[in-house]
């Protein structure tokens, strides 16, 4: 079941060579998702300025997601595999630990945003939009991180 799409071929457009534009497309899509996540949260903060409506402590999920975005994308895949020419101060093990901590921060922020959504808004029978804004901010930053990390190639002349 895991490889049921291995032989599937998407229809190809002959006018555009996407392999040359892979890094550009992945970077633009990741940037749009990242921007949209923060835009939604800023909109919620403007619409609901009182702490009773949107607690200002709920912004920390987005801050930690953003920190995790930079942590995850600061480590190249070659450093994780051990293929890079420079080993750095901690080498391959340090890169893997750094990447693991980044993913733990990212998943922790996403889970905390779901907790905020359901614990502070859905069960309290108040307006749910601030909770949805916190959740979608973290979800969009999460998907932005995955696209920016794994959607690009690291080969300079691919």
Swiss-Prot record:
Pfam families according to UniProt: UPF0220 (PF05255)
Keywords (A to Z) from UniProt? Acetylation, Endoplasmic reticulum, Golgi apparatus, Membrane, Transmembrane, Transmembrane helix
N-acetylalanine-modified residues are 2
* One GO cellular component, as annotated: endoplasmic reticulum membrane
According to its UniProt record, in which tissues is this protein expressed? Expressed in brain, heart and testis (at protein level). In the cerebellum, has particularly strong expression in Bergmann astroglial cells (at protein level).
All disulfide bonds of the chain are none
> What InterPro entries has UniProt attached to this entry?
UPF0220
Q: How does it assemble?
A: May form homotrimers or homodimers.
Annotated protein name in UniProt:
Transmembrane protein 50B
The species this protein was found in:
Mus musculus
List the taxonomic lineage.
Eukaryota, Metazoa, Chordata, Craniata, Vertebrata
């Amino acid at each position: 079941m895991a490889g049921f799409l291995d032989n599937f071929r998407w229809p190809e457009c002959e006018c555009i060579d996407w392999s040359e534009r892979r890094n550009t497309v992945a970077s633009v899509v990741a940037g749009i998702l990242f921007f949209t996540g923060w835009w939604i949260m800023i909109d919620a903060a403007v619409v609901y300025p009182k702490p009773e409506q949107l607690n200002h402590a709920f912004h920390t999920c987005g801050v930690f997601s953003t920190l995790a975005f930079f942590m995850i994308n600061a480590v190249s895949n070659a450093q994780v595999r051990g293929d890079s020419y420079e080993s750095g101060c901690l080498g391959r093990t340090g890169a893997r630990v750094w990447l693991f901590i980044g993913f733990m921060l990212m998943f922790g922020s996403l889970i905390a945003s779901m907790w905020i959504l359901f614990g502070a808004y859905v069960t309290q029978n108040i307006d749910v939009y601030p909770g949805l804004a916190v959740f979608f901010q973290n979800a969009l930053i999460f998907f932005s991180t995955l696209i920016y990390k794994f959607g690009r190639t690291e080969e300079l002349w691919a």
